[in-house]
């Protein structure tokens, strides 16, 4: 009895198909670009705001704030594969949810940096593998004949292509993590305050704030006839499709559906409704048809619609920009040159750099006390101020920025702490140019001079005193000698009873008057 062959036989075509795709990638290389799905003519550029009929008072874009930063949260993207039925036909594809898109999502130029300037085309695999993409899809539209990137393209903070204000649906992420969807003026694209770090252009805004927005997009982006038919046909024809958007949690959404123009796949209405049911809030349509490609971990994971050079096989098309999901990266990757990127978050290396990108100078709550400028080395104080936070006025004898200059005033005049001008109207006095207080050598010199002056003064006073004493001594001696050489008067002692005094008195009278009777 023969062994059952059913399950094994069903695997053979699938394996052959995968081998065929792999062989095409390795051997045949370039596709024939035969599944074209173009929204506009190739030869005509539309002017800015062409046919725009925006409702009065309604903003032309939606901004979604970034989710709260959670360094410990998982950054793994969730890829879901679906096979769903639309109008009785089965459609297979992928829907990817990406957490923390500011750090895990990038718009890549074809073949790497410089691809748009050089008008290169490359397969999604060739662009995604060197960039380390875990998940990658084709991105924006391009000119098939020249490879020119169309619309706005900002790749990792670099504006590499500008639409000049041409109105097509845009999807971008600003430096602070805000997700922007909709229509942008040229000034908004070039905004220097909160610039875009990732931005690309699509065609047709599929979902706006949870509602399908295709009709409004057709009015804004115009209905023009082109090589593959009208803009209406571009919207309504079934084909392979790709899209990018976000959900209510701020997660980025990538959508891919296999198909072939007019044979299998989805139209834009079906894709928009499918995304709306997946809680997508805003989304735009990206390049589809033969460009639609999905790469997982560096390997083609979709079924291209373009034929290889050998019509037996299908080959991925060489496209333009690529949307890439990678391991968490810092924005900017070098943390503005002031930090180290660790698991998608910048750890600032300086004491004064702060912020998600280490790009904000912070010198503390006092902010240099409004008397200085905060720099990466701390506060640089204005003239007349000093201290770590510029809160102290210059000490006496110093002036200028940070009080680094000594005053040059003479005669102890005042010195302006800001300009250094000498003015007698100032209350404070200038000190010596070198220091605000005398140095040890100056103190020693001052002490020696003082003691010398005091010593000389004392010696002088001592000499004067000695001279005066000698003069007095000599004068006293001369007076004494004069009394010894001349007459003297005898004064007898007085008796107690007075008799001797009377007799002596009478004797003296007789002696003094010899002519008395």
UniProtKB/Swiss-Prot annotation:
Residues 488-495 are annotated as: Mediates the interaction with AP4M1. The chain crosses the membrane at residues 454-474. It is found in: Golgi apparatus, Golgi stack membrane; Golgi apparatus, trans-Golgi network. InterPro entries: EGF-like_dom, NAGPA. Residues 26-49 form a propeptide. Its EC number is 3.1.4.45. One of its GO terms (biological process) is protein glycosylation. Residues 49-75 are annotated as: Disordered. It is an enzyme of class 3 (hydrolase). The keyword Transmembrane applies. It catalyses: N(4)-[6-(N-acetyl-alpha-D-glucosaminyl-1-phospho)-alpha-D-mannosyl-(1->2)-alpha-D-mannosyl-(glycan)]-L-asparaginyl-[protein] + H2O = N(4)-[6-phospho-alpha-D-mannosyl-(1->2)-alpha-D-mannosyl-(glycan)]-L-asparaginyl-[protein] + N-acetyl-D-glucosamine + H(+). Its main location: Golgi. Homotetramer arranged as two disulfide-linked homodimers. Interacts with AP4M1. This is N-acetylglucosamine-1-phosphodiester alpha-N-acetylglucosaminidase.
């Amino acid at each position: 009895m023969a062994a059952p062959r059913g399950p094994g036989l069903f695997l053979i075509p699938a394996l052959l198909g995968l081998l065929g795709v792999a062989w095409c990638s390795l051997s045949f290389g370039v596709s024939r670009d035969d599944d074209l799905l173009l929204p506009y003519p190739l030869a005509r550029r539309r002017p800015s705001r062409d046919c725009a009929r925006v409702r009065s008072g309604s903003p032309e874009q939606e901004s979604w704030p970034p989710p709260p930063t959670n360094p410990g949260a998982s950054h793994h993207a969730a890829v879901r594969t679906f096979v769903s039925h639309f109008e009785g036909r089965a459609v297979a594809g992928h829907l990817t949810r990406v957490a923390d898109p500011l750090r895990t999502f990038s718009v890549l130029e074809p073949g790497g940096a410089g691809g748009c300037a050089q008008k290169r085309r490359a397969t999604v695999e060739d662009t995604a593998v060197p960039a380390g993409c875990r998940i990658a899809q084709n991105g924006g539209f391009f000119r098939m004949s020249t490879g020119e990137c169309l619309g706005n393209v900002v790749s990792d903070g670099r504006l590499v292509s500008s639409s000049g204000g041409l109105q097509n649906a845009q999807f971008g992420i600003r430096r602070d993590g805000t997700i922007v969807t909709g229509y942008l003026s040229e000034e908004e694209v070039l905004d220097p305050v909160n610039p875009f770090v990732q931005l690309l252009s699509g065609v047709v805004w599929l979902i706006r704030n949870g509602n399908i927005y295709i009709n409004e997009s057709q009015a804004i982006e115009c209905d023009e006839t082109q090589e593959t038919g009208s803009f209406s046909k571009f919207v309504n024809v079934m084909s392979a499709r790709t899209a990018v958007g976000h959900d209510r949690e701020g997660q980025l959404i990538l959508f891919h559906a296999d198909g072939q123009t007019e044979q299998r796949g989805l139209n834009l209405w079906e894709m928009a409704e499918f995304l709306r049911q997946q809680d997508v809030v805003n989304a735009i349509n990206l390049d589809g048809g033969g460009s639609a490609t999905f790469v997982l971990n560096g390997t083609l994971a979709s079924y291209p619609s373009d034929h290889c050079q050998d019509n037996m096989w299908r080959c991925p098309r060489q496209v333009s920009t690529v949307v890439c999901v990678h391991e968490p990266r810092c924005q900017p990757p070098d943390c503005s040159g002031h930090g180290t990127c660790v698991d998608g978050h910048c750890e600032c290396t300086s004491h004064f750099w702060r912020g998600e990108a280490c790009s904000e100078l912070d010198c503390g709550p006092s902010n240099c006390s409004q008397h200085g400028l905060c720099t990466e080395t701390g506060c640089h104080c204005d003239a007349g101020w000093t201290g770590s936070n510029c809160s102290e006025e210059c000490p006496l004898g110093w002036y200028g920025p940070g009080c680094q200059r000594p005053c040059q005033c003479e005669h102890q005049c005042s010195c302006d702490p800001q300009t250094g001008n000498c003015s007698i109207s100032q209350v404070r006095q200038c000190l010596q140019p070198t220091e605000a207080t005398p140095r040890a050598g100056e103190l020693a010199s001052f002490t020696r001079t003082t003691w010398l002056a005091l010593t000389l003064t004392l010696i002088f006073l001592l000499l004067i005193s000695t001279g005066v004493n000698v003069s007095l001594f000599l004068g006293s001696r001369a007076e004494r000698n004069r009394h010894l050489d001349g007459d003297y008067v005898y004064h007898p002692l007085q008796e107690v009873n007075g008799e001797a005094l009377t007799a002596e008195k009478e004797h003296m009278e007789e002696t003094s008057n010899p002519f008395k009777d």
